[in-house]
Swiss-Prot record:
The chain crosses the membrane at residues 56-76, 87-107, 126-146, 167-187, 237-257, 332-352, 375-395. This is Probable G-protein coupled receptor npr-8. Belongs to the G-protein coupled receptor 1 family. Residues 1-55, 108-125, 188-236, 353-374 are extracellular. Residues 77-86, 147-166, 258-331, 396-490 are cytoplasmic. It is a multi-pass membrane protein.
Length: 490
């Protein structure tokens, strides 16, 4: 602002034609009040809107801290939960937890006021830390989708320390890639002063004449030492990276591998139905005629427990279809929730960075839409622990144990048939397959036992701990009904 503009708000009582008009000091108290009013008028949101946004962000952050904290605690406190799949879930929960903690102080509060309240270090830190955690979260979800597909298809056991170490290495690689993607935020974001009144002579409260400047410190992509075109190119590059790795790549991976997994499960459900087809009906006339000759032998063969009835076959087929439909719905929810939560933020950020919304009449509206889209995308840190943790039965058992132990201060009685099993594509592939396309479940069991088909194969028992439950076919392997019930591959 020019001196004559400031003089309209803080009149010094001197004629503009005076020789000392430019150097005559202003009243310091008047300038301070004027600057405060100007700063208040430039606040992006009204007090009512600030209360609403702050309340919603607090609810999101608290819910995310509780949900992701429970997931982390469930994996860390017991060795049986430290599997390859759970290491990836732990990595996702850790990134979401950090984002929940840093959301309000580093993302929301600086956006309320026109001035950035922190130092140069926190200007970089406040952008790099949330940015790298968002990238880590989305990349982990992508890796989990790939791992989930190959886990179910090949049934790779993941429980020992060496195999979990591979998952830890994958998680570290995800963090490194996330930091590299956030590196432009560290290099090019700086604090800069936006001055309103610079080097103005004022008289302070003690009556001394001093020189002061009034302005706001802002954290932004600065062009100091660089041409404006280069700064704009850097901004566009960061926007393209954000759209690609925060939305397009994760959504593409989720869609492709979840569709492949859904088709795989439906195909094997059909194979299972054919394998469990009811036997050929027995002719009553022949039965009656033969029973007169050899009643005891044929009666025992007809009532043999190894021959499933038509009713039990239909029941098992319906259960299989229900499990497949439930899993399909969960996979659709994973991809759909990600697409719905991140699309508004990705779209509005892309439009703002490429200056496709430059109408000054709608600046306030764009500010509110942008903040609302950010708030919607932050809901993912609450949804992720629910989709990847609470819908897993093994995690629910651990959450129940944590509740009884630390809230009710008592020990929960463990069910007799509790089952801990996990599969992961990061683990080494088992060479001793238990099932092939030419063999049925019954013949496989007979070959392994040599006497009856009710025993499980020896190789399968050595790799998986079974408490109870019948076996089911998935692809060219055998998994458990209880495993499918617990959604351990999801």
């Amino acid at each position: 602002m020019e001196v004559k503009d400031i003089d309209n708000y803080c009149d010094r009582g001197i004629s503009p034609n005076a020789s000392n008009y430019l150097t005559y000091p202003f009243d310091g108290l008047c300038l301070q009040k004027f600057f405060y009013q100007l700063q208040t008028s430039l606040r992006r949101f009204t007090p009512y809107e600030e209360i609403i946004y702050t309340t919603v962000y607090i609810i999101i952050s608290v819910a995310a801290v509780i949900g992701n904290g429970l997931v982390i605690m469930a994996v860390v406190r017991k060795k049986t939960m430290r599997t390859n799949r759970n290491v990836l879930i732990l990595n996702l929960a850790l990134s979401n937890l950090i984002l929940a903690i840093t959301n309000i102080p580093f993302l929301w509060l600086p956006s309320i006021d026109f001035e950035f309240p922190y130092s140069r270090f926190f200007c970089k830190f406040a952008n790099v830390l949330p940015g790298s955690n968002i990238y880590c979260s989305t990349l982990t979800i992508s890796v989990m989708a790939i791992d989930r597909y190959y886990s179910v298809k090949k049934l790779k056991i993941a429980s020992n320390r060496k195999q979990c170490f591979h998952a830890v290495l994958v998680s570290l690689a995800i963090w490194i890639v996330s930091f590299i993607l956030s590196l432009p935020l560290l290099l090019y974001y700086e604090t800069s002063m936006l001055y309103v009144m610079r080097e103005i002579r004022v008289v302070d409260q003690s009556g001394q004449e001093v020189i002061r400047s009034y302005g706001w410190r802002q954290c932004r992509l600065v062009s100091a030492g660089r041409l404006p075109d280069i700064t704009q190119s850097i901004q566009l590059l960061m926007s393209i990276l954000q759209v690609a790795f925060l939305y397009i790549v994760p959504l593409f991976v989720l869609s492709i591998f979840n569709v492949k997994l859904t088709r795989f499960l439906k195909t094997n459900a059909n194979k299972m139905s054919k394998t469990r087809a009811p036997p050929k009906r027995f002719d009553r006339s022949d039965s009656h005629h033969n029973s007169l000759k050899n009643n005891n032998n044929h009666t025992s063969s007809l009532r043999s427990p190894s021959m499933p009835s038509i009713r039990s076959s239909i029941t098992e087929r319906n259960k299989t279809n229900q499990r497949t439909n439930r899993t399909t719905s969960l996979l659709i929810a994973m991809a759909g929730s990600y697409a719905a939560l991140w699309f508004p933020f990705t779209l509005i950020t892309f439009l703002i960075d490429f200056e496709l919304i430059i109408n000054q009449d709608y600046v306030n509206l764009v500010e509110r839409i942008d903040q609302t889209c950010k708030m919607v995308s932050m809901l993912s840190i609450c949804v992720n622990p629910f989709l990847y943790g609470f819908l897993n039965t093994n995690f629910r058992h651990e959450f129940s144990d944590i509740y009884y132990r630390y809230i009710r201060c008592e020990t929960k009685s463990q069910p007799a048939g509790r089952f801990h099993h996990d599969v992961s594509s990061i683990a080494h592939h088992r060479q001793d397959s238990v099932y092939n396309d030419e063999a049925t479940l019954l013949t496989t069991g007979r070959q392994s036992n040599g006497k009856d088909g009710s025993s499980s194969p020896i190789g399968f028992r050595s790799s998986v701990r079974v408490c109870s439950g019948q076996t089911k076919m998935i692809g060219d392997r055998i998994v458990l009904d209880d495993d499918i019930e617990k959604d351990s591959f999801v």
